[in-house]
């Protein structure tokens, strides 16, 4: 039986990505950078990220558009319902695809075009590029 892909394997189809709300979990961003993606990570608090990942302090509810403009995908992992709309909006503003995972059993509160099974659970496609 074939194992589902990792989130990084799915997102690696994009060359420039922004992770919103990286917090203390840079694993996916690091894996994407290892696959050759240009990765920018954002959070409202200062975070430690691998040298291969660019970090920018930003609040997605009041985003600095320049942080996202070059991205062809914006994603948020363990994204709480109250931030989902802001993540989708910033992706839409720059013409980027948008992917979300949720926290445990929390719902997706934005429209999604696809639910992909990944090794860690579900990856929701909230916006195609």
Swiss-Prot record:
InterPro entries: SAM-dependent_MTases_sf, UPF0146. It holds the Pfam family UPF0146. It comes from the Archaea. Gene3D superfamilies: Vaccinia Virus protein VP39. Belongs to the UPF0146 family. This is UPF0146 protein VNG_2609C.
């Amino acid at each position: 039986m074939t194992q589902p892909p990792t989130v990084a394997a799915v997102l690696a189809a994009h060359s420039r990505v922004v992770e919103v709300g990286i917090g203390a979990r840079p694993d996916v961003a690091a894996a994407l950078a290892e696959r050759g993606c240009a990765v920018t990570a954002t959070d409202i608090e200062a975070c430690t990220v691998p040298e291969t990942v660019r970090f920018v302090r930003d609040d997605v509810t009041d985003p600095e558009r320049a942080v996202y403009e070059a991205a062809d995908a914006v994603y948020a992992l363990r994204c709480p319902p109250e931030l989902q709309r802001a993540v989708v909006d910033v992706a839409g503003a720059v013409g980027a695809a948008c992917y979300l995972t949720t926290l445990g059993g929390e719902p997706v509160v934005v429209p999604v075009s696809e639910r992909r099974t990944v090794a860690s659970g579900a990856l929701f496609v909230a916006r195609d590029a």
